[in-house]
Amino acid sequence: MSFITHFESLEDKRSHINKKHDLLDVIFLTVVAILSGAEGWKDIKQFGDSKLDWLRKFRAFKEGVPVDDTIARIISSLEPNALLTSFISWVNEIREEIGRAHV
């Protein structure tokens, strides 16, 4: 399974006209930025801008990196328990692949 497989079932509650940035691009950006030390929406945006070529190895980012307010709005619109469940599922897959009881 890939990272995206764990998150693709999350409901995107944005209206059709407000979907300039792909939900999975924003989730991927947010998770990898936080794992790299980002501590807020501006840090996530800055990480995305500085690592866009690397990010595009995994996701399209057709519209580039969204501004920090857009990242915040998109992530905040997700159902927290569903997001947590997706994240735990992804981490558990990694844990199982490396044969560890704990990560």
Please state what every model-predicted region is.
Residues M1-R100:
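Dynamic "connector" segments at or just before major functional cores
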